[in-house]
Regions:
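TPR-adjacent "capping" and linker segments in tetratricopeptide-repeat scaffold/adaptor proteins
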Residues: 2-22, 74-85
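Alpha-helical repeat scaffolds
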Residues: 42-43, 69-82, 99-110
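Alpha-helical segment of the N-proximal tetratricopeptide repeat
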Residues: 16-44, 48, 85-104, 122
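Alpha-helical junction/boundary sensor with strong preference for TPR arrays
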Residues: 31, 48-49, 78-81, 112-113, ...
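Residue-level recognition of tetratricopeptide repeat
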Residues: 19, 50-55, 82, 113-119
Length: 131
């Protein structure tokens, strides 16, 4: 097996902007690493593409790490992929406290998208003292 044989799939990103996608990925990486520039990266992604749902979710999660309540961004179901809808639901359910349902949704989502870094990391935020 070659090193490239294993691919950690992520949900398809509904942005046409490569720059927004780069800011999103850098912002999520910074968020899970606890780096202060996460919100700036995610803000840049949403500024470049105001309809980029996952970047808006990332910003809301970044705000929640600072103690703000999680406010899910509105979704337009016709414009987002199934993977993005799952991602949005998992974040909302996790941060609103339904731990058992969140675990089940997360498990199902990660079978298809094991590289969804925010979803992999999210339980750490939901634990007492984890954020």
């Amino acid at each position: 097996m070659t090193p490239n044989a294993i691919r950690w799939e992520v949900p398809p990103l509904t942005t046409t902007s490569v720059e927004a996608a780069i800011h999103y990925r850098d912002g999520i990486a910074a968020l899970v690493a606890g780096i202060a520039s996460a919100d700036q990266q995610l803000l840049a992604a949403t500024t470049i593409d105001p309809g980029f749902l996952l970047a808006h979710i990332g910003r809301a999660v970044a705000d929640a790490t600072g103690g703000a309540p999680y406010v899910p961004p509105p979704t337009s179901s016709s414009l987002v992929t199934r993977g993005e809808r799952q991602h949005a639901e998992i974040v909302a359910v996790t941060l609103c406290g339904d731990v058992h349902r969140a675990r089940d949704l997360r498990r199902e989502h990660l079978l298809e998208f094991p590289g969804d870094l925010l979803i992999v990391w999210l339980p750490m935020l939901a634990r007492p003292g984890g954020g």
